[in-house]
Amino acid sequence: MASGHAQNDNIVLEVEDLKKFFPIRKGRLGRSSAVVRAVDGVSFTMKEGEFLGVVGESGSGKTTLGLTVLMAHAPTSGSIVLHLPNESYDLAKLSSAELRPLRKEMQMIFQDPFSSLNPRMTILDIVAEPLVLNG
């Protein structure tokens, strides 16, 4: 199901006011009166060829953000619009069956900092390396 968003400036992904809350179970009946706000009001736009790095402390919601954008977790609210060459889709409004063919267009890469940081390189060298390699 296509959305009414027009593609401009080679935008491939628009995330707007994304929220993902998890209920905290309390009591014998499992009733929930409180929530953990794992992702609360995140917005960003990505253009073709861009990469997004999400950095933060353990438990800050980085993985939850990625999984929610990929629709592995249903968002509590917000929009996730994927722009493909001929159509745009608000992923948060699609069924599992409608999402299935779009999943090949999306990916999340986890990075283990202990295996990716070279102790023989300076921080400047580490940060500059992908920029130099990609022009």
Range-by-range predicted roles:
Residues 1-135:
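ABC transporter nucleotide-binding domains
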